[in-house]
Amino acid sequence: MDVAAAEAALRREAHDVHGWSNGPHDVYAEHEHSYTKALVCVRGSIEFRLADGRTVHLRAGDRLVLPPGTRHSAVVGPEGVACIEGEQR
């Protein structure tokens, strides 16, 4: 995965673009954002669980856009994860 290209593409449509990473099996409790969140997985994997019951699995190269107010939780895969994200314009 070309991380620099993915970040450049995200910067064209979002602001406050930043990267983050987590270790294997880390968990994010259910929460929501007041903005549209655009996220690209650049390494590893993560599973997002949406409040409506859907599950979205992301691996390197996959992208997810969460509209404002979308309640979600997440569980990192067995190899950890690294993502870049931003607030979509």
Where do the model's predicted regions map?
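Short, charged/polar surface micro-motifs in flexible loops or helix N-caps
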Residues: 24-25, 43-46, 53
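Short histidine-centered beta-strand/loop micro-motifs
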Residues: 27-33, 49-50, 56, 75-76
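Ligand-binding loop in jelly-roll beta-barrel domains
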Residues: 68-89
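Short, conserved beta-strand element in jelly-roll/cupin
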Residues: 32-48
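Conserved short histidine dyad/triad with adjacent acidic residue
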Residues: 16-33, 68
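A generic "binding-loop/recognition-motif" signal
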Residues: 24, 34, 54, 70-71, ...
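Short acidic-glycine-tyrosine-enriched beta hairpin
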Residues: 52-68
